Amino acid sequence: MKRTAQLGGGTPGRSRTAGRARSGTPPNATTAGMAALTPTWRSTAPRRLRDAMGRFATGVTVITTADEGEGVHGMTANGVLSVSLDPPLVLVSLGRCRMAEILPRTGRYGISVLAADQQDVAMHFAGQGHRTTAPAFTWDGGLPFLPGALAHIGCRVADVHPAGDHVLWIGRVKHMTHRDGDPLLFYAGRFTGLA
Ligand SMILES: Cc1cc2nc3c(=O)[nH]c(=O)nc-3n(C[C@H](O)[C@H](O)[C@H](O)COP(=O)(O)OP(=O)(O)OC[C@H]3O[C@@H](n4cnc5c(N)ncnc54)[C@H](O)[C@@H]3O)c2cc1C
């Protein structure tokens, strides 16, 4: 895969020890579970989990919703998963963010799967972009989506599961469209693409 810009801020990145194999076995791990782990292992676990799971390459999406009072809101997310084909369910994993405050009101969200040439869109909706023009939206089934995306998936929120410091928003798919093209990918804290 080819490498492009690395993100800063709160996005997954490479650790100083990236490239060296790192042990995934916690010191002093016993059948007693997490309580037996050392304080150091526990305090470094979030960073190391980001680094480890950052090696799981993903696509990049923009989640959108529309609120009567506030209009369209969008955010970049790669914590997106196909959960079930019948019934058709997907999930989006959200941390503390504005989207998570708006979704209980709208009860619906759209997933735009970004194409290789939409890195600037991903940066913008992650709050890290420098767009000079406001992004346009296209509407389908009453939900806004990003034009130029490879797929549009519209969902009604069917279930909500708090999970640690995130919440899993399970959506029942109401409509979907897709086209062929190269995807935008995210790997080890960087946007990239197919080789
Ligand atoms: C590759 C990647 C994957 C990520 N995956 C996840 C994930 O799975 N889960 C997670 O919780 N976080 C994820 N994030 C982080 C997340 O994108 C940011 O924390 C984001 O800022 C959260 O958005 P928000 O809802 O809090 O809204 P804001 O931070 O308020 O909005 C995000 C940005 O979108 C712009 N924006 C929103 N609506 C509009 C509009 N209608 N018109 C124009 N601009 C608009 C805002 O101006 C802002 O710049 C990811 C970030 C990256 C880079």
Each language-model region and where it sits:
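Basic, polyanion-binding surface patches
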Residues: 2-195
